[in-house]
Structure formats: C-alpha cells, structure tokens
C-alpha cells in the first residue's frame, strides 16, 4: 500500500464554506508540505482518500449535494469543505494506492 500525503496549513485569513481549494496549488495564505495528490474522479476520492482537518477525520463526499464534511470538486486535486476554514487550520489529504508485488 502506498500513501501519498499532502498537508496544507492556513497561514492567513479564513476560507468560506464551499470554497474550492486546489490542494496542489492553493494560492496565497497557505503553507504546503508533502507530494501532489490528484484524483481520477469522485469515486476514487471517496474510496481511496482520507481528509483530516486539525487532526479530525472528515467524511468525504462525491459532490456538494452529498452534504458531507469535505467533497470532491476536480481531478486536479480540488476539494471543498462544508465549513469555514480559519487561520492555523491544518488540512491533511492522504490518498491510498494499492501496490502489487513483483516477482
């Protein structure tokens, strides 16, 4: 099992609920750690990804209509939260990929 991890720390200001965040290029006001993470679609996001906000696991959804904590927006790695994010909030995105043994 391979795990790709992306960590974002909000360094300035708040982000309104349901605002799209590109986890690989979130723009100003964010500090980034880890590797880029992308999704092939909403199914891959909900089945292979765990998202944490300030250490608490968030319920992932395929779209805003799922009314979950965080939902898929685009394959580039864009997500949105159902709640406002604040300065110093830490977002962790863990994507799990099954690896096959060779030999």
Language-model region placement:
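Glycine-centered tight-turn motifs at strand-turn-strand junctions
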Residues: 65-67
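A surface-exposed beta-strand-loop module
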Residues: 69, 73-88
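Extended beta-strand solenoid/passenger and fiber regions
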Residues: 1-63, 85-87, 92-103
């Amino acid at each position: 099992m391979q795990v790709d991890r992306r960590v974002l720390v909000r360094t300035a200001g708040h982000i309104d609920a349901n605002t799209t965040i590109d986890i690989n290029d979130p723009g100003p006001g964010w500090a980034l750690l880890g590797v880029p993470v992308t999704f092939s679609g909403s199914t891959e996001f909900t089945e292979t990804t765990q998202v944490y906000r300030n250490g608490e696991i968030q319920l992932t959804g395929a779209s805003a209509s799922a009314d979950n904590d965080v939902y898929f927006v685009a394959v580039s790695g864009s997500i949105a939260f159902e709640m406002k994010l604040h300065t110093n909030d830490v977002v962790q995105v863990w994507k799990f990929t099954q690896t096959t043994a060779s030999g």
